[in-house]
C-alpha cells in the first residue's frame, strides 16, 4: 500500500493568520515601559503597608545599582543592577539561606542590608523600623544588633592586633561592659566559640583557617547582635573544618536565639543550617520558601538545575542532571523579559519579552516564572 501525503484545501492566507494569532508580536520598548509602570505602582502601594510585626528583618523591593559609565553631564550611561527588586522576611531565631551562582548578587545584598552599601531604592525593616534612609550616625547605634562574618578569615582580621585586642575593641567602642570587665567578657566569648584562653595574646597569623573563622565569629558575638550575616563563612575552609564551623554556628544560634542570613553556593550546607531558602539569579529572587518546601518541590527551572548538580550519595538512585546551556549574561546588560530565558530549558516566547511576576504559589512559596504560572 502506497504512502500518500495528506492534502488540505485550507488557503495559505488563513494558515498565516492562525500563525500570527499563536505567536503574538511584542513591542519590546512599549512592553518595557509598561512593566516599569506596573512595578513602580506596586512598589508605591507596598510602601504604604505596615511592617510585618512577626519579622526581625523585612526587605521590600531592595535595589542596589552601580553606575559604570556617565556622560559628560553626569547622566548614567551604563548601570549594573547587582540587586534588583528583592523582597523577603526573616523571623527571630530563623536562618535564611541565600543560594545562587557566583555574581548573582548574594554578597552585595547582604552588605546592602547592613548598609555597608547604600541602597539605591527599597525598604529595609529591622525590628519594625525602616533603616534604609538612616544616616551613618543613626546606623552606628544599630551596629551592635547587626553583624557580619566575612568569607575570607585570612584578610578580615588585622594582622598587627592580638586576638584579645581584636575582640576587645568593639566591646570598648560600644561600651558593652565596664572597662574592668572587658577581658573576662572577651574570654567568655572565646570559650563559647571554642578558643583557648592563651589565644588571647596571640596574632592571627599563628592560627589555621578554621581557628581564624572562630575568631571572626567571636568578634561578631562580642556586641551581642540579633542578626548576623554569614557571607560564605565556610567556603574557604577544608570540608572537615566546615562541619565544625557550621555546628558552632548552630550551637550559638540556639544559645543566643540569633537570626542568620546565610549566604552560600553549597546547597548541602544551606540545607543543613537553613529554615528558609531564597534562590537568586542575576540580582533577582527567583524562588523563596520554607526549606522543606523548596527541596521537596522546587518549581523554578533554575532551582531545579541547581539541585540536580548536587551529588547523590545513593549510587542506586539516579538523578537526571539538568545542564544549563550558555554563559551567564552580564548583570550590566541583562536579557529583556525573564533574565533566565537565554539558558532556560522551558523558555517560551513570552519569556523573551515580559518579566514574570514574583508571586505566591503556596503558603510562603514564591516563584517568578511564566511556566509555573501556566501550570498553576
Predicted segments, located by residue:
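Conserved ABC transporter NBD signature motif
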Residues: 122-130, 142
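P-loop NTP-binding/switch modules centered on Walker-like glycine-rich loops
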Residues: 229, 233-237, 241-319
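A short, proline-enriched helix->beta-strand linker immediately N-terminal to the Walker B motif
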Residues: 222-226
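Short catalytic/signature loops enriched in Gly
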Residues: 39-55, 68-74, 79, 290-376
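Conserved ABC ATPase "signature" region
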Residues: 130, 180-198, 307
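Helix-to-loop junction immediately C-terminal to a conserved catalytic motif
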Residues: 114
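Conserved ABC ATPase signature
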Residues: 203-207, 211
Amino acid at each position: 500500500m502506497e504512502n500518500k501525503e495528506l492534502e488540505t484545501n485550507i488557503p495559505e492566507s488563513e494558515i498565516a493568520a492562525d500563525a500570527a494569532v499563536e505567536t503574538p508580536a511584542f513591542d519590546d520598548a512599549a512592553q518595557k515601559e509598561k512593566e516599569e509602570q506596573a512595578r513602580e505602582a506596586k512598589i508605591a502601594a507596598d510602601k504604604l503597608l505596615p511592617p510585618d510585626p512577626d519579622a526581625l528583618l523585612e526587605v521590600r523591593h531592595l535595589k542596589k545599582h552601580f553606575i559604570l559609565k556617565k556622560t559628560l553631564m553626569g547622566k548614567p550611561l551604563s548601570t549594573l543592577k547587582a540587586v534588583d527588586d528583592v523582597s523577603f522576611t526573616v523571623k527571630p531565631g530563623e536562618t535564611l539561606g541565600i543560594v545562587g551562582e557566583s555574581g548573582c548578587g548574594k554578597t552585595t545584598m547582604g552588605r546592602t542590608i547592613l548598609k555597608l552599601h547604600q541602597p539605591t531604592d527599597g525598604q529595609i525593616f529591622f525590628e519594625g523600623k525602616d533603616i534604609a534612609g538612616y544616616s551613618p550616625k543613626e546606623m552606628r547605634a544599630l551596629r551592635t544588633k547587626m553583624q557580619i562574618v566575612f568569607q575570607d578569615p585570612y584578610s578580615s582580621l588585622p594582622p598587627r592586633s592580638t586576638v584579645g585586642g581584636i575582640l576587645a575593641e568593639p566591646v570598648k567602642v560600644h561600651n558593652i561592659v565596664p572597662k574592668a570587665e572587658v577581658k573576662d567578657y572577651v574570654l567568655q566569648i572565646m570559650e563559647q566559640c571554642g578558643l583557648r584562653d592563651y589565644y588571647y595574646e596571640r596574632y592571627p597569623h599563628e592560627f589555621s583557617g578554621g581557628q581564624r573563622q572562630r575568631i571572626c565569629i567571636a568578634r561578631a558575638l562580642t556586641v551581642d547582635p540579633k542578626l548576623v550575616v554569614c557571607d560564605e563563612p565556610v567556603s574557604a575552609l577544608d570540608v572537615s573544618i566546615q562541619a565544625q564551623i557550621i555546628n558552632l554556628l548552630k550551637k550559638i544560634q540556639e544559645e543566643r536565639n540569633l537570626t542568620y542570613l546565610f549566604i552560600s553556593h553549597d546547597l548541602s550546607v544551606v540545607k543543613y543550617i537553613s529554615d528558609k531558602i531564597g534562590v537568586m539569579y542575576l540580582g533577582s529572587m527567583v524562588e523563596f520558601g520554607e526549606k522543606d518546601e523548596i527541596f521537596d518541590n522546587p518549581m523554578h527551572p533554575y532551582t531545579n538545575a541547581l539541585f540536580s548538580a548536587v551529588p547523590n550519595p545513593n549510587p542506586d538512585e539516579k538523578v537526571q542532571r539538568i545542564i544549563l546551556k550558555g554563559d551567564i549574561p552580564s548583570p550590566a546588560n541583562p536579557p529583556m523579559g525573564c533574565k533566565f530565558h537565554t539558558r532556560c530549558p522551558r523558555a517560551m516566547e513570552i519569556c523573551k519579552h515580559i518579566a514574570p511576576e514574583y508571586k505566591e504559589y503556596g503558603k510562603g512559596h514564591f516563584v517568578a516564572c511564566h511556566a509555573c504560572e501556566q501550570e498553576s
